[in-house]
Amino acid sequence: MIFNLPIADIQHKDTIFEDDFSNNVAGWETIEDEDEKACIEKKHYFMENKTESRWMFYHKELQKGFPKNFVINTEIEILDYKGYGQFGLVWGFSKPHHVLNRFVISAEADRFTVSRFEKNHSRTFHRFSGGYEKSTPGSQKCFLSLMLIEDYYYFFLHEYSRPVYICHQSHLHSEGNRFGFYVEPGIIIRAKNIKVQRIITKPGFDSRAWMPLGSELINGR
């Protein structure tokens, strides 16, 4: 089960998109060729990047657009990888998808990256990388959550009660309403679920960067 985020200063969360991949009513891309494979299989969204140098992404549009405050969270399991590479979430881009935001973790090391970049990687507008500790060493299951609340992004991994990174919304400008998964060469993953929720903050929230306390975490596992 996906972990719930800390709820300090949050009055209500309203689910606007949720998929457990029991079917493909949502219309995720399905494909199989010499470069990639993507399919709904055994209540998971399976994604394989067979190339040696080209990243892949699998995405859809949030029909009514992202609200002012929102959270995206997902559970992803890495099945195999060759060499090094990253996988995770992409969001905030349009159909031409020239510029994207991503929140990804490394396949071979306990590291993560948050960045805004051009599709061809010729230019990176914002980038931050850091390390983290898995709650269960050796586990192949990864829990990622990204939240935008009153102009600040918060990024969570696994059971951390505190975000691994915080930045102002201006660093990760949104170009559109598409979101989905990112997979680099040689990596095979499957997603168990993904959820997007609208967040309503409590009256009087002062909009400053908020650092949640450990006691405010609700573990949804």
Placement of each model-derived feature along the sequence:
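Extracellular carbohydrate-recognition regions
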Residues: 2-32, 202-220
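Beta-strand-rich interaction surfaces with strong enrichment in secreted/lumenal proteins
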Residues: 6, 57-65, 129-136, 168-169, ...
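Extracellular beta-strand elements of beta-rich domains used
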Residues: 21, 191-199
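Carbohydrate-binding surfaces in secreted/extracellular proteins
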Residues: 21, 74, 136-169
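Short carbohydrate-recognition loop motifs
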Residues: 36-56
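Secretory/extracellular carbohydrate-interaction modules
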Residues: 49-119
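Short, aromatic/His-centered strand-loop micro-motif at the edge of beta-sheets
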Residues: 120-145
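Flexible glycan-contacting loops in extracellular carbohydrate-active proteins
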Residues: 165-192
